[in-house]
Structures are given as C-alpha cells and as structure tokens.
Amino acid sequence: MGEQQLDQVTSDELIYVPASECRRLLDARLPPHTAAEAFASVARINTLYMIARAWSGHLGTSFSSLDIMSWLFLNEMRDLDRGPGACDIFFSSKGHDAPGLYSVLVGLGLLPEEKMDNLRRLGGLPGHPHVETPYIQANTGSLGMGVSKAKGMAIANRLAGHPRRIFVLTGDGELQEGQFWESLASAARQRLGEIVVIIDHNKIQSDTWVEQVGDLGDLAAKLRAFGWHVSRCDGHDVGAIDGVFRALDGIADQPKVVVADTVKGKGVSFMEGPSMKAGDLYAYHSGAPTETEYANASMELLDRARGLFAASGLGALATKSARRPARREPRVTQNLISAYRDALVIQADRHPHLVVLDADLVKDCGLVPFAQKYPDRFVECGIAEQDMVSMACGLARRGALPVAHSFACFLSARPNEQIYNQCSEGSKVIYVGSLAGLLPGGPGHSHQSVRDIGALGSVPKLLLAEPAVESEVHALLEYLVDTEAESSYLRLVSVKWPVPFDYPAGQHVQPGQGWVVRDGRDLVVIGYGPWLLSNAWHAAEELQSNFGLTTRLINLPWLNRVDPAWLKEAIGDCRVVQLMDNHYVRGGQGEMLAAAIAELGLDPVTSVARVGVTELPECGTNDEVLAYHGLDVASLVDAFRAVVRRHSSGTVSQLA
C-alpha cells in the first residue's frame, strides 16, 4: 500500500521497446506459450521504463503479475478489437500493478505508445487505475472491492443479455480485507460462473512477508468453503497458466479462483522477493530505481527479451532510448514523517502504556524505530483498517493508549464507523493519517486524501490537528498524548517541503488557536500544513513586492475546532479574509471557519473567500497538480488579489 517518494538522483538514459516490436511478435503467429513469454518480457522492460521516468510507481507487484496479464490479454480475453464496452472484462483489484497493465495495453495497441512517457503526469496515465483510461474497467481505492464489483458487472451483463467473462486480479495481502471474504458467498449462491479471480500470490505485502502479518493458512480450503472452484498454478509458467484455464473451460455454473504462485519483482534478480535477507523490508514495492538499479535491472530484462526473440526466429529486438527527466529536490526541507518518527519514540519512552498499531505501512508511517525498540508494544494489523480500529478500541477500554496508523485516505474512510463507535465510548485513541492532502500528486485520487477532514470532523469527542513544521509535530503529539482527554486525529503531509518560516519560540499549544506566520494589514489568510502555508507565504511576498498589499498569514493547526475569541482577535480590524484548504472546499477547515466568522457578527461585515479542491483530484507531478487545482503560488496570488478587489468594490461575500 506504500507510496515512497524518491530523493534527488541524476538523470540517466532509459530504454523501452516500441509497440511495433510487440506487433511484429504477435504477427509472427508463434505458439501461444512462446508468444506470451516473449510479450511479458517486453512488458517488464516498458514497465521499468515508465516507473523510472515517472520517478515513482510499483515495480514489485507489476512484475509479479505480468505473466498472468500477458496470457489473459493474448489468449483469454475475447473481442478486444470491439472495444472496452463489448469485450471480456479484466481489472486489477489491487491497483498497484497499473504500470504493468498499461505496458500490456500499449503492446497490444490499445493505448498509444507515447502514453508511456506520461505515467503519473497530468493528462497522462494515472498512478492507480482510473476508468477514464481506455480498457480500465474499475477504479481502485481501499483494497478488497474487486470481487464485489465483478458480481455487479456479471448481474448487469446478464440483465442486458450480453454475458461476458470477468477476470479479477487480486493481491494476497489484499485478502486481509474483510470485504473480499464478504463478497464470496453470494457469488457462489448466484452461480456467477463467468467470474474468474486470479490471486497474485507473491507472498509479500508492501514491505514484508504476508505470513508474518496475517498468515493465509490453507487458502484453497478457505475459498472452497465459500463454494468457489479453486485451482492453483505457477503464475510465471505460461504453460501452467494455460492448463489451468483450459481446465476451467468446462465449469460453467460456479465462480472460479486461481491461486497463482508468483514472485514479487519477478524478472530482476535483486528485486525478487526471495533475495530479501532475513529481517529486511522489501525495497521495491514503491518508488523508482536509482541510476545503478535501473542500469542493472534493464540489462537483465533486455538480455532475457533478446534471447526469447532470437530463439523464436524474430531476430534482434529493436529498442528506443530516452532520458529520464531530472528531478531536483530542495536541499533544505521539512520532513514531517521523520519528525513524527522521532516524536513517537520520545512519547513511547515516557508512556509505557502507549501501543502502536499499523495497517501495513510501517515504513511509510515512520514506525520502524518504534517497532524495533518496542516490539511487544507494536501490533501489525495488516490491510485491515476496520479490525485495527476496533482493536485500538479494545486496548483503550483496558487502559492502554493506542496510536493507530494508516494513510489518511484509508484511515478516515474504511473504518469510519469503527472510529465513531470508539469515540462514543469515551475512550482515548490517537489516529495518525499520513499521505494527507493533495500531494503527492502521482498516486492519483484514490490516495489523495482530500475528504478526511469532512469524514472525521463531525465525530463527537474527536479533535483533528495538522502540523506545518517539524517542531509542531513534536508539540502537537506531546499535547495529544499528555493533555488532550479525548481522541484525536493527527493529519500528516508526507511530502518533504521547503518551509520559509519556523515554529515560534515559546509557542504553546492551545486547541482552537493558531499562530501568526507573517503579519500584515490588508488581508488575513488562514490555513494549515507545510506546502499550503509555504505557497501562501510566497504569494504574500509577491503581493507585497508587486502590489503593495500586506498579508497576515495565520497557521491554524486545528481542523475542526476554533476558539471564537481568538479568531476575532486574529482577524482584528481587517475585513478581508481568505481561507485555504488542502482538502475539498466542502467539509474542510475553511467551511468551519466561514461559519464561525459569520457568527462573530463583525461590523462592518467581513469579506470571506475560500480556496481548496473543488473536483476529483488530478494525477500528475506536484507542480502540475497544484497549478491545476489553483493552489500553486501564482494561483494564490490571483485568489488573494481577487478577494481584496471584491471587498474594495463593495462586493461582500461570506461564502465566496
């Protein structure tokens, strides 16, 4: 489930195989096994190319599934030439393997070759599947949805009189999600034999072994108990894959599942799961290869593909080269995850009843040092957020202080009812949602958590907070552990960001109150978080230097609570207020503040404008995404000037 961000490395030469070579391979009418094996070898080269060029993606799970996807699209999927609305259906429920699927679609001519240059770019191929892309049949989000979606598709197809086979690829870590098991029984009862689920059983979830998190036990027996026909094969042996599907041809009235034993990172020796040393975390779940890793990986993949082409009588494999765009990271940045990592251990040292729970994101959430220092107080719950939250509820009821972690997009949504239930009991749990907000933009909307404030902000006895700088991480966590009596949600931006201001010396944490980042008299701007406030700070600089307008920029780290007296004092005599959200405008902090300002009854009336996300988040580089959604520096300058102009012209709005 992780989303690792890479630091600066130099540009380097990348190699890909043009789609014309795949067409040459398919036109040669080779035996199906030979063609599929060669096609998959090319798809791995192009998957590596896309992820390296994009600077992020999921190599390990793409590589483990490519032999399966290649066989399905070359030999099982019917009527592909009739378009995505008329052919058999394939989609990945795990979603991380999107680059692998794109490489297959490009190789078949179902996506333009130039799309490979635009993985995780605005207007390009999204980091996770999105139905706006041709032949992508379902979006992904929290894991475990795939079989349920397939059932709905099967019933709709039957009602329309257009039955189609439906192939669903899942991960093995995904089987820890309860929805997967909920979805099985009714499929068997309804005899949905057109559904075939393939489990990419690569034995590794995110960064560690599945058996160390939630051992699947006798998986085949469990699946059979739900009424499914179960087969098993080597997921990298196209002959074995073919044999399994031919055996399934005669089974019409029973849903089918194929357990495909695979290797995460298959095709590159040092990326393959079995190469992990005992105790290590798997290094190639997310992120992108370094220059050296790319050179070594591409050499292995090219050697294999060239050998397969030559052995098939196709001659030399044609390739093309391109340069990986330079990615330059600022040298001095605020890293809130690293700060949280350190702050958590400090609090654990002081509070022996503090217990940490994780939902398969130990590295991304900064939990490795805690897990190493306090293994008895660390609970890895796997990809099972609802179970994790209810476990935290039980811990809290018996006197422990649970701190539960996941990405904000998952922690706020999937276990929302469990969080509400826990808070209703009056116990204390600290929830920590990382990867919060619009950035990073590369993973796409399924991971861009821009609705968590709205989802959790109305829960009684739950305080929401977001730090802007590393020092504030320490201060807020200490307050939430030591002082806050009720439950809380700490929202953490994961991207590193250069922040042009510091946490004020001697600043005391007061719920509902913030602090002035820079002072001014013409406009009050209130926001939170590192990149949002930093962009506003730079916008304020431009306003002052270019237009003579000064801005009072305020950091309010409390997302669902404001002290009215403090707010009135913070606004002062200024009657122009701009509210900012790293979140949907609807349901964000700005909505709460706009209502609070209206209730202050200021005279003369204050002009209030809001800026934030107003539509489904776009996928792209961070700069592209910020500009698209109007949250980059230039857009904020325009927004700030606009609200000042409206107020000056007498156009007063409290909900602009």
Language-model segments: residues:
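Short hydrophobic beta-strand that contains or immediately precedes a catalytic carboxylate
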Residues: 170
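Thiamine diphosphate
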Residues: 2-167, 306-491, 496-497, 506-508, ...
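Alpha-helical transition-metal enzyme core signature, strongest for iron centers
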Residues: 173, 422, 578
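Active-site glycine- and acidic-residue-rich loops that bind
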Residues: 173-180, 234-242, 410-411, 467-474, ...
